């Protein structure tokens, strides 16, 4: 707002000098009227009140450590160097149980021949590993 045009004006566009006095002209102080006369404004601005949704109990939910096949493909040679995997018959043998990983997911590309041992595989991960000439071994 251009304030220059209010220079020399006593009330700067606020009407008479009484109009900007007190809290009554602005509907109360602070959060007053939040559930009464300011509620309509809050609804129009999209604020929401109260509880929403559902929170799952911690006993029900569990965190699964995962890895994507694309990451496995990139890290295969590094894992061999570190002694966490081995190469047999031209295939990288990776046991994910020893690494503390429970599930293999299918994001990424597989270019190497991988033989992966894990508790769980997603359908796309299993498909990509087997299409590249590798195999998936279910650990129990």
From Swiss-Prot:
Region Disordered, as annotated, extends over: 1-32
Question: Could you tell me the keywords of this UniProt record?
Answer: Ribonucleoprotein, Ribosomal protein, RNA-binding, rRNA-binding
The record's listing under InterPro entries reads: Rbsml_uL15_N, Ribosomal_uL15, Ribosomal_uL15/eL18, Ribosomal_uL15/eL18_sf, Ribosomal_uL15_CS
Q: Which SUPFAM superfamilies match?
A: Ribosomal proteins L15p and L18e
Say which domain of life the source belongs to.
Answer: Archaea
CC per GO annotation: cytosolic large ribosomal subunit
Task: Give a yes or no for keyword Nucleus in this entry.
Answer: no
- What is known about its subunit structure? Part of the 50S ribosomal subunit.
Protein name (record): Large ribosomal subunit protein uL15
Could you tell me which species this protein originates from? Methanosarcina acetivorans (strain ATCC 35395 / DSM 2834 / JCM 12185 / C2A)
Encoding gene, per UniProt annotation: rpl15
């Amino acid at each position: 707002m251009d304030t220059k045009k209010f220079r020399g004006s006593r009330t700067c566009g606020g009407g008479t000098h009484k109009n900007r006095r007190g809290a009554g002209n602005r509907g109360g102080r602070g959060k007053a009227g939040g559930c009464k006369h300011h509620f309509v404004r809050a609804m129009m601005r999209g604020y929401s009140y109260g509880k929403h949704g559902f929170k799952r109990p911690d006993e029900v939910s569990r965190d699964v450590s995962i890895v994507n096949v694309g990451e496995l493909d990139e890290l295969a040679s590094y894992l061999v160097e570190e002694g966490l995997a081995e190469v047999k018959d031209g295939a990288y043998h990776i046991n994910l149980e020893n690494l503390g990983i429970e599930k293999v997911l299918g994001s990424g590309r597989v270019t190497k021949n991988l033989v992966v041992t894990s508790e769980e595989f997603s359908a796309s991960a299993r498909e990509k590993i087997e299409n590249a000439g590798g195999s998936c071994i279910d650990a129990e």
